[in-house]
From Swiss-Prot:
Recorded name of the encoding gene: gltX2
Function text: Catalyzes the attachment of glutamate to tRNA(Glu) in a two-step reaction: glutamate is first activated by ATP to form Glu-AMP and then transferred to the acceptor end of tRNA(Glu).
First-tier enzyme category under EC: ligase
Protein name as annotated: Glutamate--tRNA ligase 2
Residues bound to ATP: K253
Keywords linked to the UniProt accession: Aminoacyl-tRNA synthetase, ATP-binding, Cytoplasm, Ligase, Nucleotide-binding, Protein biosynthesis
Subcellular location: Cytoplasm
GO molecular function: ATP binding; glutamate-tRNA ligase activity; tRNA binding; zinc ion binding
Family of this protein: Belongs to the class-I aminoacyl-tRNA synthetase family. Glutamate--tRNA ligase type 1 subfamily.
GO cellular component, one term: cytoplasm
Catalytic activity line of the entry: tRNA(Glu) + L-glutamate + ATP = L-glutamyl-tRNA(Glu) + AMP + diphosphate
Amino acid sequence: MTVTVRFAPSPTGRIHIGNARTALFNWLFALNNKGRFIQRFDDTDIGRSKQEFADAILYDLHWLGIFPDATEYQSRRFEVYDAAVERLKAAGVLYACYETPEELDLRRKVRRTRGLPPVYGREALALTHEQVAEYQADGRRPHWRFLLPNFTGDPLQPERTEVHWKDLVRGEETVDLASLSDPVLVREDGTYLYTLPSVVDDIEMGVSHVIRGDDHVTNTGVQIALFKALGTEPPVFGHHNLLTTVSGEGLSKRTGALSIESLREDGIEPMAVASLAVLVGTSENVAAAHDLTELAGHFDPAATSKSSAKFDPDELFVLNRVLMHHMPFDEARDRLMVLGISGEQAEPFWLAVRGNLDRLADAVGWWRILREGPQDRPEFSDDDRDFLGQAFEVLPEEPWNGTVWKDWTGKIREATGRKGKGLFMPLRLALTGLPSGPELADLLPLMGREGTLARRP
């Protein structure tokens, strides 16, 4: 059997870090099992779903390193769902209901006052032909519910019916179908809710493993029953913990600051996002992986905590710095070129400055300093100005080699008697305009003698 997973968001907005966690869990699981990854858009809500969001989601996934084996749209598969509806009706497990939302709300309140669970009481099953005709004459159109198999003889007398499955993440799980309402599969206007298309597509597309957030645990009992009603054994399920903000709030597509788009625009590397999204809330230490293949080696669904995990954006910047500090020039070259950093000096420049970068785009500032000199001229005391005058007088002649910084500072020490911070800080300020930064031993050869002398205060 080929392992087949799917990531199935609704294209009603940009995806956030929590959505990315689900996509990455599926991708890494497929990677570890030589399986297939299907990108499926649950776009049956025609009014809210937009192709531009679907395209944006695919762009975000590609940026993360996820390249689906197939892309499917539920909005193009209504005939398949219609056929499944007819099968369920023929089997007597999909029934018409005519209650209005107000009537359903009133019934829930009545059940609560009687100490009963606020689930649907299947009153529609007891409707007479006359009552149905009257509803239809009044212009009411039915919605359709799936009859859960939680009874022995009389569906109006549900009894405890446990559905069990071994969850990839959570271990043994149980849902009592008697505690649930029969789910509405088809609305009054004939459109589909999430449940039926999802199950039908999982069957039709050969999905072997469904990995998603643990807010779907209760849904799983219903879906297992629906799989069986359609004559198919259910897939293996895995429900990972959800990410929250640092303050404990749930993430949503309106959590703009944590959208993949905003993180990308903020200069965060895709592997910083992927590493934190996958490893936070697991027994693994959070560390920056170089690529998804390396990250897959640290991925085990069973190592995921059952408790929600807080996603701290500050941790992203820590991981981002690690990735910057170790990024080979070959990986950075094309992106640096877009920023205007190219030529013979590009590689030694990158190797000199990468250890001081939070984001790759920060290299632009150091490139300007290298090419143009300090962007803000520092102020010096009279003593430091005199010291710098002497220092620039003993600047070695070219050609320079890798020891020029050591040679120069040795001469400065002999000429001025200064050492330590008193020697190095005025030089750093004169050469770069900043009190800290890359090793001057690496920058000085890139400045050249003429460029260095031009920085003399």
